[in-house]
Amino acid sequence: MTTNAETVAPNQQVEKKRLGFWIDLFRRLIREKPLGTFGLFVVILLFFTGIFANFIAPFPLNAVHLVDRLSPPSAKYLLGTDQLGTDVLSQLIYGARISMIIGVIGTLLSKLISTTIGVTSGFFGGKFDMIVQRFVDAFMAVPQLIVLMTIMSIIGNGMFQVILVLGITTGISSSRVIRSAVITIKSNMYVQAADAIGCGSIRTMTRHILPNIMATIIIDATIIMGAIILQEASLSFLGYGVPPDIPSWGSMLSLQGEKYMQQAPALALWPGFALSIVVYGINMFGDALRDLLDPRLRGGVGRYTLNNKNLKKLKKSLRNHQLAAKI
């Protein structure tokens, strides 16, 4: 019984430390990063809207009211209607669901690919790393929008196709970030010690490399998510994204805003505004996480440097440590 209690106690302490880390991170985000807090609010709002779109939207999906075509904002239609009489607010809400699904699944696929390429390339190095990086260089040399349009024209439109293409392309491009982090971690003594005692490559990568680059992966995932949402909107605007019957912010800009810009400019304003706010919020949240998780950048208040107040506290703390050392 004593052995079991002694075994359980350290595990509970580890769980408390992990929970305390995330609570402390959230508190520091609220206290030190106002733009990051705004970004977190935008991310939560996007997920909430996407999950509960059926309950939030005033009208069902693709509900048409031909009598009320191109109606201005009113009590019945808060943001007006489009050329078919479809409620614009409902389309925006259902479009948030599409952006959430494509953004989340595409980011997970992207991080799986980028982590696999980056970790193996950075860990093994040598000729393998050189061959992989030359392939990545060649891929990044071509404008990504052209690559996306070419692939989508071959495999056809569809949500699955968009997720697959965006996940693979962004994963290859962002593998450079993971590779750089792996090269930095690989030079540490504990990785070299693991190699010296005979740890296999798979064990070293999973036990010593991956846990120490999780901060980099999380930060990069937030940035990639914003990029994927923006690229999906670009593809849908050009006609290479999701089918027209699926509400998307990009297709709303293309099918409604472009054709009725003079007659009803709000049709382009609202999806463009929603897209801008979501991408901006996700990027601000990612920047705040980068500052909070990177020890070299800690201490800022919405910025990337130490402010005067925190700098004075740091100097005072250093003086106290120096005095204590002399005593």
PLM regions with names:
Residues 1-111, 115, 126-127, 245, ...:
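Gly/Trp-centered helix-boundary motif
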